[in-house]
Amino acid sequence: MTTFGAVAEWRLPSLRRATLWIPQWFAKKAIFNSPLEAAMAFPHLQQPSFLLASLKADSINKPFAQQCQDLVKVIEDFPAKELHTIFPWLVESIFGSLDGVLVGWNLRCLQGRVNPVEYSIVMEFLDPGGPMMKLVYKLQAEDYKFDFPVSYLPGPVKASIQECILPDSPLYHNKVQFTPTGGLGLNLALNPFEYYIFFFALSLITQKPLPVSLHVRTSDCAYFILVDRYLSWFLPTEGSVPPPLSSSPGGTSPSPPPRTPAIPFASYGLHHTSLLKRHISHQTSVNADPASHEIWRSETLLQVFVEMWLHHYSLEMYQKMQSPHAKLEVLHYRLSVSSALYSPAQPSLQALHAYQESFTPTEEHVLVVRLLLKHLHAFANSLKPEQASPSAHSHATSPLEEFKRAAVPRFVQQKLYLFLQHCFGHWPLDASFRAVLEMWLSYLQPWRYAPDKQAPGSDSQPRCVSEKWAPFVQENLLMYTKLFVGFLNRALRTDLVSPKHALMVFRVAKVFAQPNLAEMIQKGEQLFLEPELVIPHRQHRLFTAPTFTGSFLSPWPPAVTDASFKVKSHVYSLEGQDCKYTPMFGPEARTLVLRLAQLITQAKHTAKSISDQCAESPAGHSFLSWLGFSSMDTNGSYTANDLDEMGQDSVRKTDEYLEKALEYLRQIFRLSEAQLRQFTLALGTTQDENGKKQLPDCIVGEDGLILTPLGRYQIINGLRRFEIEYQGDPELQPIRSYEIASLVRTLFRLSSAINHRFAGQMAALCSRDDFLGSFCRYHLTEPGLASRHLLSPVGRRQVAGHTRGPRLSLRFLGSYRTLVSLLLAFFVASLFCVGPLPCTLLLTLGYVLYASAMTLLTERGKLHQP
């Protein structure tokens, strides 16, 4: 029994009350046991609006489970004529409003492990075979249309429609219409299935980002699971698309009929009819293949997901997509309608600038897109070998097979490339870029989702990429080459000492180092860089059409067998004929790879230096420092970078990732061992006499060292630093946060008076050669003052200035930790019935013994110095 099957009887309270009032209005009394009977008996009661008002009231007063049970009963009992009025409200109440104010059922936060009851109810209600989809098909059979505001579409689509330029996707063809008031209030006339999927897809974009404090795992939320279910249902890897649910036996939902456009549009791409209509025109017997009636749902689902999730990029990218042929067509259209009655309310420049607001996809958005790409690869690779071959492309091929063959290049490739470029250029330089990286790498490896994929190889012997994937690599050359160069530029600006950043470099290097993949990419670049063969007619038709738009069953010219021409058409279709291509295996990219290899070597040494410094600090040193008996570190410790709790395990992971990444880069670009060894030797020359702390990258000029761009980057990111020591009077250093300001100033005045009053006596005591002289020198002489000098990477010179004599420093008594330790000592002494005076004497005696021992050790160390 399902969740909704447990309901034995359903009553809508408001309609039930209405049936009780009816006998007061009519002489003949009648009792109705269901709202449906009352609605059918009294149609003049305006049942649809009354039903909507009742459902709205129940959504506030009733529990969520009861609301869903009521909705299931309404969908089953009421006809489509009455259900179409509640459909827009129901869709908005589920997915939230388009402006993001209403969150609806909050599918992005609903998780089965947190709210198991609500989760199961929602998943059953919104399942592809559930009640909500049954309502969609019920309305679909009656050919109802619903208005969707153009203003909530992605920026590029909205701007082009407001300019009366038809977007390249056939999803918008014959759907744009004006509102009765005119102006810019444009709407799309969508059928119920399109309206539902539009809201479902846009709820990922329009809703506000999840708060940071709310820890929600995207892969466990209801929205993510629903996306996976819809993709598995409408883009099946096995079998055909299940037929739609219907209230009548054997009934099916018709495909959307063509609509007459309400306003004239110019197109900046070659658009054609939908897949279903094109397929029907080529088939002699349509009824023989039931899938031909339903393939439009799969096509619509994919188009909506791609348009809503990937159609986001900057104004510059929008202008770059316009081919010369398209611009001439748009210009001719504008000249022809310049004297027409209709003129856009916004000038052209304003319309193009209408979507310049920055769009930054969230990590959740990227994870959902990655799920789409992984499923599309599995969907496209589910073709049988005889179906995937070019010779199988005939009129006998089913629409679903055609859809599998052309789904990725026809619908996804261009918009995904622009989306990835936008992410690579605008995503913050932090560890969250991992989501974008994995999305990109998932698209680059379709062989991982093939049904005949090999067993994963070990790390020492990765599996070889089969030659059958060479066409995919060549047809997606820019995905591999240009985005790889973009990743190199990002990696050179990140802190590779961080394990998360080191992992990203390792992941990319590992994917591109798969055997035979680098050779395929290099072969594709060679095909593109070959001298261009002039083919006037074909070249104009393909190179000037920047988008793979329209239906993939459109009558294109015969397929060109020349591999070089195919690669050129791919690059020019995405970047234009005037693009400046940077080869991945060219000198510019190789220079970036060498810089990255140098940065990896530096990051390994930096991580090792941090690990060594942490290991050298003994436990007892921190305890004495807390008690205030250790020397004050006036220059601070090495804080090279802001690692997340850097420890030995993190250092080990970083070193492992960087070591393997360096080896993979060497394999991909055939770097010699001598080149990598040169980086290590050059790194050793910049170390100081301790062999640990490294100076930033510099060159020696006439006035000393000059920072290189790499050196500036190292300082900004905390990878390197110059060792700057405090050379002034330690007593005049700024007051620390762990010191009492008023007490420090009082102690400074007291010690200054003592030093001024007894300077001669202290100098005489320190000049003695016996134990008393050593004891006084240990306490009255600044330990590092005599050896202070100006540090310079080029040379060293002693500090010019007068020599200070022995002095007394009482500043350590102004520290909170010193006072707390003294109070703690007095408290412990009081527990043993020791008074303040005896305790003071004991502390003084203990310190004298400690100082005497340190004096002897210091003098013995000086005797052994050369």
Swiss-Prot record:
Coiled coil: none annotated. The keyword Magnesium applies. Activated by phosphatidylserine and tumor necrosis factor (TNF). Inhibited by scyphostatin. Its EC number is 3.1.4.12. GO terms for molecular function: metal ion binding; sphingomyelin phosphodiesterase activity; sphingomyelin phosphodiesterase D activity. Optimum pH is 7.0. The modification Phosphoserine is found at S169, S285, S792. GO terms for biological process: cellular response to tumor necrosis factor; ceramide biosynthetic process; endoplasmic reticulum organization; glycerophospholipid catabolic process; sphingomyelin catabolic process. One of its GO terms (cellular component) is Golgi membrane. The chain crosses the membrane at residues 822-842. It comes from the Eukaryota. Keywords: Cell membrane, Disease variant, Endoplasmic reticulum, Golgi apparatus, Hydrolase, Intellectual disability, Lipid metabolism, Magnesium, Membrane, Metal-binding, Nucleus, Phosphoprotein, Transmembrane, Transmembrane helix. It is a single-pass membrane protein. The keyword Metal-binding applies. The modification Phosphothreonine is found at T708. Widely expressed, with highest levels in heart and skeletal muscle. Changing A661V: In NEDMABA; uncertain significance. Induction: Expression is induced by DNA-damage and TNF. It catalyses: a sphingomyelin + H2O = phosphocholine + an N-acylsphing-4-enine + H(+). Its cofactor is Mg(2+). Catalyzes the hydrolysis of membrane sphingomyelin to form phosphorylcholine and ceramide. It has a relevant role in the homeostasis of membrane sphingolipids, thereby influencing membrane integrity, and endoplasmic reticulum organization and function. May sensitize cells to DNA damage-induced apoptosis. In skeletal muscle, mediates TNF-stimulated oxidant production. It is linked to Neurodevelopmental disorder with microcephaly, arthrogryposis, and structural brain anomalies: An autosomal recessive disorder characterized by severe global developmental delay, severely impaired intellectual development with poor or absent speech, severe encephalopathy, microcephaly with simplified gyral pattern, hypomyelination, thin corpus callosum, mild cerebellar hypoplasia, brainstem hypoplasia, congenital arthrogryposis, dysmorphic features, and respiratory problems often leading to early demise. This is Sphingomyelin phosphodiesterase 4. The gene is SMPD4.
